[in-house]
């Protein structure tokens, strides 16, 4: 059974790094960025089993189209594909996609219009005790519990959560086998939201988005931890562009208006031009209404090459890329042994932007500009006032005439 989709209408100032500048200069004009895009969300279901479905986000610009294909077949995964035509489409052949050899089961057509493509796969959810933890991102020293393989989760029908008004949908899942009952009242959710123009969400971390991006919020809610002060982590796999792994960068600023006390922005950049990217603040939250009081550090390990067959396989990644010779992975760890944690309210959320082209760059906020103006302007005004006072004083002395 096959489905074929026709075109539808529908934190602070950071200087540009040499890498970003080269991306800006070298990317084709059609993919340098669109101020607005016509965005559509469509659920593509297997007619033989409606519980098997894909979420296709199609963002059409003047001379380009961005395709985000989200899937819960196997581990949660997303394909990022950018084309240089506003008429590219997604083709899905369910019979091939679900077979042992899924080559050609998922394609973006015409294939020659593809300018960039890669994928992210969320493979495992880690849990470990935070006791005596020194470097959670690379080697947790506390007790490590058996990880949850996200390929062995059961997920909701994405159609039930599709919201065209907010251009969002949510994959919500729990382990198929849960002998400890940890997820009896809990779930792991992946909320996806697309954008037709630039802006900033109302809730922290308030990542600046553009029409070339979509946002993913990962939330662990209500699951019973296996330790008194458990920390959780997420394993993320991606495809390298060539023999190496994508690059990881840190941007720093003096502005924390949108995410208080967080002065860093982390980025993952793929190497091809135009590049795809991930962008996130190194912060997670232990309450649904994120605030400074519920902020937890988010640590990321370095990207390292890995063999694809050692990771849970995503059918859509296998179908689109055929061979996966250059896989890389890294871990994200949320929280620390002290401070806010998942144990507060059995809640954890983390947000990331995915996109193609040049990552959004924050300008200094009006508040910071005002503070800088006052800080720099006050001394100048004092000097000016002092100079005027001296001049007026000298003038008065020169006008004085002795009565003698």
UniProtKB/Swiss-Prot annotation:
Q: Which UniProt keywords apply?
A: Glycoprotein, Lysosome, Membrane, Signal, Transmembrane, Transmembrane helix
User: For this protein, what post-translational modification is recorded in UniProt?
Assistant: Highly N-glycosylated. N-glycosylation is essential for GLMP stability and for MFSD1 lysosomal localization.
List the Pfam families. Answer: NCU-G1 (PF15065)
Glycosylation positions in this chain: 63, 132, 157, 185, 228
Motif Lysosomal targeting motif: chain residues: 400-404
- Entry keyword annotation includes Repeat: no
Transmembrane stretches in the record are: 371-391
N-terminal signal peptide: 1-26
Q: Does the keyword Signal apply?
A: yes
Instruction: List residues in topological domain: Lumenal.
Output: 27-370
Where, in residue ranges, is this chain on the Cytoplasmic side? 392-404
Report the GO terms under cellular component. cytosol; lysosomal membrane; lysosome; membrane; nucleus
**What is the recorded membrane topology of this protein?**
Single-pass type I membrane protein
Top-level taxon: Eukaryota
Q: Its quaternary structure? A: Interacts (via lumenal domain) with lysosomal protein MFSD1; the interaction starts while both proteins are still in the endoplasmic reticulum and is required for stabilization of MFSD1 in lysosomes but has no direct effect on its targeting to lysosomes or transporter activity.
- Its name, as the record gives it, is Glycosylated lysosomal membrane protein
Annotated organism of origin: Bos taurus (Bovine)
The major lineage groups are: Eukaryota, Metazoa, Chordata, Craniata, Vertebrata
